[in-house]
A protein has these predicted regions:
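Terminal and domain-boundary accessory regions
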Residues: 1-198
């Protein structure tokens, strides 16, 4: 089974995959995700795209980014842009679509299959361009909830659509299995660290 899909690249829209898995009630186990696709073919790249808020002292996504970076993924980040909307509310924007699209087109001549983890309809034209270059495209998102988290035009354009629910047993983890963040353990008040049972 090691070369059934040929040469593969995984392109993960981090924010989109996060919201999809949360809506379905499970976390993604990125170690298992990598192993699953390594077993399906020759995995050339696994790229995770996410925007980060740079001016925060602590970012909740930083431990994940660091782990991915050291465990077989290429991580592409971009600082978010902060602005005030028309009603005076602070908004944060960080879109990684262009970075993902450029990487996909550059990878096209080196892979047989691209697996895109996103439901964003903006990627329909990208999928079509990849197909014109002879690349098969699998899109992973979900139609298992209402409203579906994948744009209909993206699902129709893909060579294969895989509902994330179908991968849950292979790449999912129950949120209750999540270990406490190292930062919380390191910043625990001293009096909570001592054994007071004496």
């Amino acid at each position: 089974m090691s070369s059934s899909l040929g040469k593969i690249a995984l392109l993960i829209d981090g924010a989109n995959l996060y919201s999809t898995s949360k809506a379905l009630g499970f976390d993604i186990d990125y170690k298992r995700l990598l192993k699953e696709f390594q077993s399906r073919g020759s995995l050339l790249r696994a790229i995770y795209y996410t925007a980060v808020i740079e001016d925060q002292e602590y970012s909740s996504i930083r431990p994940l980014i660091d782990w991915l970076d050291y465990n077989g993924y290429t991580v592409v980040t971009k600082a978010t842009k902060e602005f005030i909307d028309a009603s005076g509310r602070r908004k944060v924007r960080g879109n990684m679509d262009i970075e993902l699209a450029v990487d996909a087109l550059e990878l096209a001549e080196h892979v047989d299959q691209i697996v895109l983890f996103s439901g964003d309809g903006d990627f329909r034209s990208l999928v079509e361009a990849l197909q014109r270059r002879g690349v098969r495209v699998t899109v992973v998102s979900t139609i298992s909830i209402q409203p579906p988290l994948i744009a209909d035009e993206l699902r129709r354009q893909a060579d294969v659509f895989t509902d994330l629910v179908e991968l849950k047993s292979k790449v999912g983890r129950d949120p209750s299995e999540r270990p406490p963040p190292r930062e919380l353990r390191q910043h625990m008040p001293e009096f909570l660290q001592r054994d007071t049972s004496v």
